[in-house]
């Protein structure tokens, strides 16, 4: 699926596109709450840097994430950028 010039299947293959095509979603699973919280901390710091914030929830070792650009009412490059960063943070945390 091409969105805002990005091939989502190639760039962020682990993310699911919503039925209306306006958001992407993924649930990250970690070994325990500590890892999930570390992941969320890394993501929160990065989100502040780029001024783009996820909709998310945490339940023990799982973090469910939904990304969209509310001001545009659609997916944008910022969502893809944050999704890629979140994938990298998840790998980083899971390797510890």
Regions found by a protein language model. Give the residues of each.
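Charge-rich alpha-helical segments
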Residues: 1-96
């Amino acid at each position: 699926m091409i969105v805002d010039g990005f091939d989502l299947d190639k760039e962020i293959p682990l993310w699911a596109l919503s039925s209306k095509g306006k958001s992407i979603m993924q649930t990250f699973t970690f070994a325990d709450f500590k890892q999930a919280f570390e992941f969320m901390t890394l993501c929160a710091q990065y989100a502040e840097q780029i001024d783009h914030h996820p909709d998310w929830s945490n339940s023990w070792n799982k973090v469910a994430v939904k990304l969209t650009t509310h001001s545009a009412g659609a997916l944008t490059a910022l969502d893809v950028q944050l999704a890629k960063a979140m994938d990298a943070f998840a790998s980083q945390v899971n390797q510890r």
